[in-house]
Swiss-Prot record:
UniProt-listed Gene3D superfamilies: Exonuclease VII, small subunit
EC numbers on record: 3.1.11.6
Function text: Bidirectionally degrades single-stranded DNA into large acid-insoluble oligonucleotides, which are then degraded further into small acid-soluble oligonucleotides.
Keyword Coiled coil: no
GO MF entries: exodeoxyribonuclease VII activity
Record text on subunit structure and interactions: Heterooligomer composed of large and small subunits.
Cysteine disulfide partners in this protein: none
Pfam families per UniProt: Exonuc_VII_S
Originating species: Bartonella tribocorum (strain CIP 105476 / IBS 506)
UniProt lineage: Bacteria, Pseudomonadati, Pseudomonadota, Alphaproteobacteria, Hyphomicrobiales
Principal location: cytoplasm
UniProt keyword list: Cytoplasm, Exonuclease, Hydrolase, Nuclease
Protein name: Exodeoxyribonuclease 7 small subunit
GO cellular component, one term: cytosol
Gene Ontology biological process: DNA catabolic process
Length: 84
């Protein structure tokens, strides 16, 4: 069963909404029953959704902080979480 692919401005989507749309695109492309021109269009939208998700993850990652502990073990401050 072919699932509907949403259209519209990707930049307004939350991470969860963008990820869900990306999953629908992958399902449709994996089934192989989408015409070539439409496959190209939805692939391009999938790439844009992927970039949007990566951007949102980087923003979230920048907000995550690691708690610094004093020698006694009590919280002393925060520092950015190292990207790994």
């Amino acid at each position: 069963m072919k699932k509907e692919i949403q259209e519209g401005d990707i930049t307004t989507l939350s991470f969860e909404q963008a990820l869900k749309q990306l999953e629908v695109i992958v399902e449709n492309l994996e089934r192989g029953d989408v015409p070539l021109e439409q496959s190209i269009d939805i692939y391009e939208r999938g790439e844009a959704l992927k970039k949007h998700c990566e951007k949102l993850l980087k923003v979230a990652e920048a907000k995550v902080e690691k708690i610094q502990l004093s020698q006694e073990g009590s919280p002393e401050g925060v520092e950015p979480l190292d990207a790994q």
